Design a protein with these regions (language model features):
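Conserved, function-critical positions that sit in or immediately flank catalytic
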Residues: 145-228
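A glycine- and small-residue-enriched flexible loop/hinge signal that marks low-structured segments
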Residues: 1-145, 225-441
């Protein structure tokens, strides 16, 4: 062992074979045209599989930018990806005129209070892929036994100037402890009963109810036919009745189930595939779950769904049955229940989604999100197969501003594809190459 008793130089040998040097991390960035995903928003992607999960698969019309991103991820593990869409792009919606919702921030700003007038749901992102979605929501009326689907007049009777109809209670239960009696109105033709309109299909029936027609006439009779139970009832372990939070507040019938289906197979490859489902959510705006997190169905769908946004409350409800959806559960309210068909008349197929390729200005706007080096860490900026004006924009307005990132601009496809032996000459002589700003970045 060496000792130093006075100032001098001490020489030591150290084995560095067990030292693993730190590897510099490179972060890529790209703005482009992708099939799916949030638009004009930076999303960190870590792998090729992750790229497909967030932005969809490449298609025959949308593949250049996906391939560039995929190639980078074959070597790197961090790619900041921005999807941009054209002005004509639209999210698929339940009904009405489709809207464009680029990302969650714009949703919160413009549609979170139900301003869209497009029905209860919209696809999470713009594009035709959203047209494959079907959304169903069920409460106790559609997931608890059968409901009255139709009536048949078996005898028109005579002498009626006014008539009423009553339905017997669900077999074996009473409205207070397990079912709701159906209701309806009678239409006359002359002095005869012509038809019965169901105003509330009820629920909890195991056999068809008995119909009794009253009024100032006589001899009119009718029968009821039950409709099929909710198609997706078996996807859930329990009937949506009342949540614990609502029960503690004295409220009832606030619970709903929501399920999202790939109706056409365009997403999963198999029509009818269940994409996601949410059990035991609440109609109450103040609802909390067992972990004290929001359980209001609107909030849960917006925060956790990968496929849809809430856009409005359903209109097919029995308005006379209780408080509106979105009310507080305080004060022991009974919430309105769904009405209409066996599925609560809330099976919604989304449509009117539109794909639209981004224009040059859209792509420039996307790359502009990389300009602030204090907010975004990026080292390598990929231009893909964009117009010369986009590459120039990246150089002048991103790289030259940041001064810490390199820009990678690909040659024009015509210069390198089917041009064997002349690639370098074509690249150097191309007018596009000469048009770019000269920069050390």
């Amino acid at each position: 062992m060496a000792f130093q008793l006075s100032p001098g130089v001490l020489t030591k040998e150290q084995d560095l074979t067990n030292v693993v040097p730190a590897v510099a991390t490179t972060i890529g960035g790209i703005s482009g045209d992708f099939q799916w995903g949030p638009a004009h928003e930076i999303v960190a992607v870590s792998s090729e599989n992750n790229l497909v999960e967030r932005f969809g698969k490449p298609t025959s019309s949308v593949y250049y930018d996906h391939m560039v991103a995929s190639s980078f991820l074959a070597y790197g593990s961090q790619l900041l990806t921005i999807r941009e869409v054209g002005a004509a792009a639209r999210n698929a919606v339940s009904t009405g005129t489709a809207v464009i919702i680029k990302n969650r921030g714009l949703y919160d700003e413009n549609y979170a209070s139900g301003q869209g007038s497009v029905g209860p749901w919209a696809a999470k992102y713009a594009g035709t892929l959203g047209n494959a979605l079907k959304v169903e929501i069920a409460d106790i009326t559609s997931a608890s036994g059968l409901s009255v689907g139709s009536t048949t007049i078996t005898a028109a009777g005579s002498g009626y100037s006014a008539a009423t109809v009553t339905f017997s209670d669900p077999t074996g239960v009473t409205p207070a402890n397990g079912g709701i009696t159906a209701t309806g109105t009678v239409a006359l033709s002359g002095n005869n009963v012509q038809s019965i309109t169901i105003t509330n299909p009820g629920y909890g029936y195991t056999s068809a109810p008995t119909l009794t027609i009253g009024g100032d006439g006589s001899s009119a009779t009718a029968t009821a036919t039950l409709q099929t139970a909710w198609t997706y009832k078996d996807q859930f372990d329990f009937t949506p009745t009342t949540t614990t939070h609502a029960k503690n507040n004295g409220a009832t019938y606030d619970m709903v189930h929501v399920i999202v289906i790939d109706e056409t197979g365009a997403i999963s490859g198999t029509a009818g595939t269940v994409l996601e489902k949410f059990a035991g959510l609440s109609k109450a705006s103040d609802a909390r779950d067992d972990l004290n997190q929001t359980n209001f169905y609107k909030n849960v769908i917006n925060d956790r769904s990968e496929w849809i946004y809430w856009m409005d409350y359903p209109t097919t409800v029995t308005s006379t049955s209780g408080s509106a959806w979105g009310s507080s559960s305080a004060g022991g309210t009974r919430f309105e229940t769904l009405s209409g068909s066996a599925a609560g008349d809330v099976s919604t197929s989304l449509g009117s989604g539109v794909d639209a390729a981004p224009a040059t200005a859209d792509l420039q706007s996307g790359y502009g999100l990389f300009a602030n080096d204090e907010l975004v860490d990026v080292n390598l900026i990929l231009n893909s197969a964009h117009a010369t004006a986009v590459g120039d924009y990246i150089i002048d307005n991103v790289a030259e501003i940041r001064k810490d990132a390199m820009v990678f601009i690909s040659p024009q496809r015509s210069a390198v594809v089917n041009n064997e032996g002349s690639e370098s000459t074509s690249i150097i002589s191309t007018s596009d190459l000469n048009a770019y700003t000269r920069s050390s970045y």
